[in-house]
A protein has these predicted regions:
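Contiguous, well-ordered alpha-helical segments that form the cores/surfaces of helical PPI scaffolds
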Residues: 127-140, 160
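Short glycine/threonine-rich loop-to-helix capping motif typified by GTGT followed
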Residues: 105-108, 145-147, 186-195
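Single conserved hydrophobic/aromatic residue that forms the stacking wall/gate
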Residues: 1-8, 13
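Inter-helical turn/loop segments and adjacent helix faces that build the functional surface
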Residues: 58-72, 140-152, 169
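Function-dense linear segments that define catalytic or interfacial modules
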Residues: 14-116
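Extended amphipathic alpha-helical segments with heptad-repeat/coiled-coil character used for oligomerization
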Residues: 170-195
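Secondary-structure capping and boundary motifs in well-ordered enzyme cores
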Residues: 44, 102-107, 118-130, 151-158
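Catalytic phosphate/nucleotide-handling subdomain of diverse soluble enzymes
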Residues: 151-169, 174
């Protein structure tokens, strides 16, 4: 009962951290620590999300698993380019555009006129590769949902691929890419309009 009532900084005591919105949590970065040495979660942020439509990948592959992996690889590179566009759009932003966020401590304590660039690297912020349609992708590719042994195997392989790509990009660019279960409330409509 007491645990369910804890909020904010009290939650840190029990290694439970509130999310940044619906489903995005800051990653645990060794480079981000408070002055007392504990991991820093509060004041960090997410640069944005780009979502891969796994159902479209499966439908485009027409049930052929080799083709599925080729298309997935291609779409992941497209997502990576889009994520880089989001990141690069933020580069050069000066703290003056949102003083409460960047100067007065909501996210940082930068000087007037200072850019937020250093906050976009080295784990201070994350940028997310979202995914949508994992269950439906499994049904299209295996005829079974992600809760069946066949579907679960494919779902885990795909999730591992997404994680591996984020790790690869992070190591190459020093930008903290993360995997994010995209809320489908508005994304479904956007995907439907594109098909």
């Amino acid at each position: 009962e007491i645990t369910t009532r804890l909020v904010g900084s009290e939650m840190c005591i029990r290694d439970s951290y509130p999310c940044m919105g619906c489903r995005s949590f800051p990653t645990s970065e060794d480079s981000q620590r408070d002055p007392d040495g504990t991991r820093k979660y509060y004041g960090r942020f997410n640069q944005g999300v780009v979502t891969i439509n796994l159902v479209d990948v499966a439908c485009s592959a027409e049930g052929h698993i080799d083709r599925f992996w080729e298309i997935l690889e291609s779409r992941l590179e497209l997502c990576h380019r889009a994520l880089r566009c989001r990141h690069e759009r933020l580069l050069g932003t000066v703290s003056d555009v949102a003083p409460i966020l960047w100067q007065h401590g909501a996210l940082a304590r930068l000087k007037k006129g200072e850019t937020i660039d250093k906050l976009l690297f080295n784990g201070y912020s994350t940028i997310s590769l979202g995914y949508a349609g994992l269950c439906e992708m499994c049904v299209r590719m295996t005829g079974k949902t992600h809760t069946s042994p066949e579907g679960k195997k494919l779902a885990l392989e795909v999730m591992q691929k997404l994680n591996d790509k984020c790790k690869e990009w992070k190591e190459a660019e020093n930008i903290s890419y993360s995997v994010y279960g995209t809320p489908m409330e508005s994304t479904t409509y956007k995907f439907a309009k594109c098909l």
